[in-house]
């Protein structure tokens, strides 16, 4: 992820079931559910959870997304926003298991 502005970015996962999002160094090594920027863990229907982090413009930040499906309904969307940028979809599709997306 390469931010276009230096400011606080809020990342959202909306998932059925669990999803986690890490950004920066934790996305590469040492990632655990307890240090995820967004921890949307558990067995549940579509639930949106968010986390915020200050990012510097034109700097590369690796992102790791982990998703788990327990049965029944399913889906995952990842979005971000800032105080000056409306909510945008980070992934261009709604991700579903067994579809390759």
Residue ranges, per PLM feature:
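Acidic/polar, compositionally biased interaction segments
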Residues: 1-101
């Amino acid at each position: 992820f390469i931010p276009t502005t230096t400011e606080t970015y809020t990342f959202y996962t909306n998932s059925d079931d669990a999803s986690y999002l890490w950004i920066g160094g934790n996305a590469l090594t040492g990632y655990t559910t307890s240090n995820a920027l967004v921890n949307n863990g558990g067995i549940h229907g579509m639930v949106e959870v968010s986390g915020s982090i200050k990012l510097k413009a034109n700097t590369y930040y690796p992102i790791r997304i982990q998703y788990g499906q327990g049965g029944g309904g399913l889906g995952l969307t990842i979005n971000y926003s800032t105080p000056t940028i409306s909510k945008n979809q980070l992934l261009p599709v709604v991700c579903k298991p067994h579809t390759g997306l």
